[in-house]
């Protein structure tokens, strides 16, 4: 009771689950024993009251916790520009640094390393907003670089955007998969974004961080 799990991350040793209602990360061992928050604190006093872990992802040995604003029941998120934070923790739940704060974040949930084969800057990340359906590009240091765009230079928008994935073993490396819940999550959609083949149609209307249009890079 009093628990609303929104996302999870799995390592070889532990299972980490984002409890949106309780504004905490629950850690379970690989034998499903709940661990003490003393040993896995996942604490950051600088996160404003009313924000809670919305998802947690494991990337390159680190845990990225994505925060969204709670509604009155602490069951669902409150969408809005700037309603989001991202922190980096080690696997013991110790805060390492703030990755991103507010700005373009709007109930962020999905996060993956940006595939270099899609012309994104090396070491960058893609962060999907559930709140507004945009996919943001961040540098390895957490600087916002722009949004993912289509071949015409318009921001790609996927209503109810949840998960992002790229380069699974069975796929080609220039495909980004997504899952979403459009129509206020009444429906479900799984799809993919694919880098358009070269040569691309120059001049680019907006070449910055456009996986379909790498000509004349910024």
Show the residue positions of the predicted features.
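Sequence/structural signature of beta-propeller domains
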Residues: 1-199
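Cysteine-dense, low-complexity repeat segments
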Residues: 196-218
């Amino acid at each position: 009771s009093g628990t609303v799990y929104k996302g999870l991350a799995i390592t070889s040793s532990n299972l980490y689950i984002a409890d949106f209602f309780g504004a905490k990360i629950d850690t379970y061992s690989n034998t499903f024993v709940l661990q003490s928050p003393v040993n896995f604190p996942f604490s950051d006093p600088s996160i404003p009251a009313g924000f809670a872990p919305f998802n947690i992802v494991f990337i390159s040995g680190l845990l990225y916790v994505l925060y969204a604003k709670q509604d009155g029941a602490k069951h669902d998120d409150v969408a809005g520009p700037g309603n989001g934070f991202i922190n980096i923790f080690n696997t013991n739940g110790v805060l390492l640094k703030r990755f991103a704060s507010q700005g373009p974040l709007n109930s962020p949930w999905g996060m993956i390393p940006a595939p270099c084969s899609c012309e994104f800057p090396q070491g960058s990340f893609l962060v999907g907003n559930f709140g507004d359906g945009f996919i943001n590009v961040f540098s390895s240091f957490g600087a916002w670089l722009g949004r993912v765009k289509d071949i015409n230079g318009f921001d790609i928008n996927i209503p109810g955007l949840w998960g992002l994935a790229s380069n699974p073993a069975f796929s080609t490396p220039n495909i980004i998969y997504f899952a979403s819940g459009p129509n206020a999550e009444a429906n479900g959609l799984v799809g993919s974004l694919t880098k358009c083949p070269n040569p691309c149609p120059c001049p680019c209307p907006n070449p910055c961080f456009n996986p379909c249009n790498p000509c004349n890079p910024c």
